[in-house]
Amino acid sequence: MKIQTNAVNVLQRTSAYLKSGLLKETPAWYNVVASIPPSTKFTREPRFKNPSNGHIIGKLVDVTEQPHANNKGLYKTRPNSSDKRVGVKRLYRPPKLTYVEDRLRSLFYKQHPWELSRPKILVENEIGDENYDWSHMLQIGRPLDGESVIQRTMYLIKTKQYGDMVEAYDHARYEFYALRMQEETEQQVALEEAEMFGSLFGVSAIEHGIQKEQEVLDVWEKKVVEETELMAARTSNPAGSWKDDTTLNTAQEEESTTSENLHF
């Protein structure tokens, strides 16, 4: 099958169209593709290192260079399917992108799981983050959360105030603790002042949910008690007595009905 090179030659064909006059205006992507032209090599080459961190992800083993023989006294001259499977499976797989911020986030929320219960607006960090000055942790228009610790840590590393990641993270974490305690103290003082001046606060969303749940549990408890008493009454009396009582009641009702019909 002939190799399709139409997508690769898009820069050459567009240049020819511009030179001949078929295209009047230069496309917006033309200069970008011209500065970084697409590759013309169609053979897949194994990557032995992860380009993001430089770690070795695998290597090809030349079985012909092994000097020893197997248990049968034979020398291997070519790789078998199992040898190829081990190397090829990872060499041609695209490397996983890893970021330092993600490692710091996982560490912070693992140490502080209750921070995940706080309300949070999910937005991309790149949108508007260039306006924040992370020389201090408190930011105008941004609540104090775990992301503040991450960005503060990265700022300390980039400005070389701390050479060690652990020391920078601990410094940002201690700043976060102090600001969180100050925030909770201010909220508690504001609540006590409002109550002192006669403010009345309704139940919170959690308390409202607990009340509704308790109402359902009360109805369930009443129903269970009635069913339990009924089952205890049935098991304490023999089955025949229930049958005899039912037969006796039915006979009495029929007798009373007959007497009423015969009464003039």
Curated annotation (Swiss-Prot):
Transmembrane segments: none annotated. GO terms for molecular function: structural constituent of ribosome. InterPro entries: Ribosomal_mS23_fun (IPR016939). One of its GO terms (cellular component) is mitochondrial inner membrane. The keyword Ribonucleoprotein applies. GO terms for biological process: mitochondrial translation. Residues 233-264 are annotated as: Disordered. It comes from the Eukaryota. It is found in: Mitochondrion. Keywords: Mitochondrion, Ribonucleoprotein, Ribosomal protein. CDD domains: At1g26750. Present with 1920 molecules/cell in log phase SD medium. Belongs to the mitochondrion-specific ribosomal protein mS23 family. Component of the mitochondrial ribosome (mitoribosome), a dedicated translation machinery responsible for the synthesis of mitochondrial genome-encoded proteins, including at least some of the essential transmembrane subunits of the mitochondrial respiratory chain. The mitoribosomes are attached to the mitochondrial inner membrane and translation products are cotranslationally integrated into the membrane. Component of the mitochondrial small ribosomal subunit (mt-SSU). Mature yeast 74S mitochondrial ribosomes consist of a small (37S) and a large (54S) subunit. The 37S small subunit contains a 15S ribosomal RNA (15S mt-rRNA) and 34 different proteins. The 54S large subunit contains a 21S rRNA (21S mt-rRNA) and 46 different proteins. This is Small ribosomal subunit protein mS23. It comes from Saccharomyces cerevisiae (strain ATCC 204508 / S288c). The lineage of its organism: Eukaryota, Fungi, Dikarya, Ascomycota, Saccharomycotina. The gene is RSM25.
